[in-house]
């Protein structure tokens, strides 16, 4: 889990005059807002650890002195493919094996520190497969299940984007109640830089946008994602199930962390890596150098597309829930909202 540069999580207001900025999909962003202080007393510095395995050396992300052994093992499993139960982790010179028997042990209680290189080996004394028995009584072997990238369903309550972003950047915390504060934070950032966040960017005046985004019946999109990418200092990748493409916010900003969302035309869900061991928490934060997870995300989107699990925003049928007028597509809904001020739509 990690917080934004210059501070922690939502719950404080950025200092006046903090720089704004927004990127379009696949475009870079500027540095994030400054002057934000940590919330809840979080002062744990992030650790920089490297792990050396058979296939090469990797940087481990999002760890601190309070990270549990099970979380460390989960990240190593995602990188190396070695399940937590088969891992041997050595450190120091001569290398000594870490005690991994208690998954709740925190890293500061182990003989390691930030900057260390961890040597990861597969324990050859443990079977790579699980024995099973055929009807003839002879043992057969089932191949070990690998971690799977999956969609985490969040409520379809007009705030799915905010709930999804919060889930991934907080390391798997589902908290729909986060949305109002995130909306207010975004409004503050936009209001602080009216020159950049102009009507040409926002599609409405700066003041109108700030009032609009704070309402709980409005949807977030590219502008809000770009602001959150800078605030959390991470690349936010949105995989589209209709076009099977990935829009990468903060791609050129040099962030070391990456999180993923999936979008079906009207709804966002977070993506996380789920491990076979139910005691291993899902992984939501990835290295920005890990392109394998992007391939997995595209495969997930393509699978959803083949099952028609998307909404064509240019052709779907809507009804205005205020005046009951029938509308087709996002453009008609947008025009209707401008003409009437009605913004509560339902899909027919």
Curated annotation (Swiss-Prot):
Q: Where does substrate bind?
A: 266
Query: Under which EC number(s) is this enzyme classified?
Result: 3.4.19.12
Q: Does the keyword Hydrolase apply?
A: yes
InterPro entries for this protein: OTU1_Ubl, OTU_dom, Papain-like_cys_pep_sf, Ubiquitin-like_domsf, Znf_C2H2_type
Annotated region described as Cys-loop, given as residue ranges? 154-160
Name a biological process GO annotation: ERAD pathway
Where is the region Variable-loop? 213-223
Its domain of life reads Eukaryota
Q: Where is the OTU domain?
A: 149-274
Q: Zn-finger regions (C2H2-type) at which positions?
A: 318-342
Q: Which reactions fall under this protein's catalytic activity?
A: Thiol-dependent hydrolysis of ester, thioester, amide, peptide and isopeptide bonds formed by the C-terminal Gly of ubiquitin (a 76-residue protein attached to proteins as an intracellular targeting signal)
Output the Gene Ontology cellular-component terms: cytoplasm
Renumbered to this chain, region (UBX-like) spans: 50-128
**Annotated active site:** 157, 160 (nucleophile), 267, 342
Localization (cell): Cytoplasm
User: How would you classify this enzyme at the top EC level?
Assistant: hydrolase
A GO molecular function annotation here is: cysteine-type deubiquitinase activity
Q: What is known of its domains?
A: The UBAX-like region mediates the interaction with VCP.
- What function does the entry list? Hydrolase that can remove conjugated ubiquitin from proteins and participates in endoplasmic reticulum-associated degradation (ERAD) for misfolded lumenal proteins. May act by triming the ubiquitin chain on the associated substrate to facilitate their threading through the VCP/p97 pore. Ubiquitin moieties on substrates may present a steric impediment to the threading process when the substrate is transferred to the VCP pore and threaded through VCP's axial channel. Mediates deubiquitination of 'Lys-27'-, 'Lys-29'- and 'Lys-33'-linked polyubiquitin chains.
- PANTHER family for the chain: HIV-INDUCED PROTEIN-7-LIKE PROTEASE, UBIQUITIN THIOESTERASE OTU1
Q: What is this protein called?
A: Ubiquitin thioesterase OTU1
* Source organism (scientific name): Bos taurus (Bovine)
